Amino acid sequence: MKLISWNVNGLRACMNKGFKEFMDSVDADIFCVQETKMQREQAEFVFPGYEEYWNSAEKKGYSGTAVFSKVKPLNVTYGLGIDEHDKEGRVITAEYQDFYLVNVYTPNSQRGLERLDYRQVWEDAFRAYLLELDQLKPVLVCGDLNVAHREIDLKNWKTNRNNAGFTDEERAKMTELLTAGFTDSFRYLYPEKEGAYTWWSYMFKAREKNAGWRIDYWLVSNRWADRIEDSLIYADITGSDHCPVGLVLK
């Protein structure tokens, strides 16, 4: 089974920059998207062979997630079921026969860490939500988690200490999530691989220099870790400031 996740930084814009071509070529069973920045009714494109599920933010042109699945899920839910967290279209959960898939676009703490306090509350609620699901079936979590977990996960870690995405608080919450029963699929297979990033600033020729961050993940319930066949970073795929990430399960 092949699964793909991509923060497209605006799906309509990405459609003009190779999204459909990549989607067709990779032929994923499930394709998850973050930061759609659109409402479903604005879509002037179709993805034949895929069921579509959208969760858009109340605020137009902001945030949003979507799941495209070849197999129709047993059930699909939107959000965490907590009003204060469910206005920005950040979570879609699809239940399948053997597992849950959770597609997430984690809130960015923002420049000046304006949303760090909210982010901490979000992290606790999201972790609790995943653990409830995990009691029922194994869980696959994908998306832009907006945190580089370890120093190896970003190029310039020294100068980014305490910047959004690499604060001690955000990293500690990621550690809490993993410790609670989840495996970072990429580090499971490639624990010491350097230069593996999924997001690059549009400034300072960051992508050209590979001065990036690994903030997009596939996490797997620990009891399914031995089913991880590969965890992929498609760094050569442009179209967004993020690149797609993939998970192949046995």
Regions found by a protein language model. Name each.
Residues 1-47, 51, 57-62, 78, ...:
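N-terminal, active-site-proximal structural segment of metallo-dependent hydrolase catalytic domains
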Residues 30, 51, 125-211, 215:
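Metal-dependent phosphoesterases centered on the DNase I-like endonuclease/exonuclease/phosphatase
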Residues 1-9, 98-110, 142:
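Active-site-proximal beta-strand elements of phosphoester/diester hydrolases
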Residues 37, 43-109:
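Structured beta-strand-rich core segments of catalytic domains in phosphoester-bond hydrolases
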Residues 70, 94-97, 221-222, 247-250:
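Active-site beta-strand termini and strand-to-loop segments that position acidic
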Residues 81-82, 107-123, 158-163:
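Surface-exposed cleft-lining segments at the edges of enzyme active sites
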Residues 60-75, 194, 203-226:
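Conserved beta strand-loop-helix elements of the APE1-like EEP
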Residues 7, 23-41, 101, 130-151, ...:
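Active-site beta-strand/loop signature of hydrolases that rely on acidic residues for catalysis
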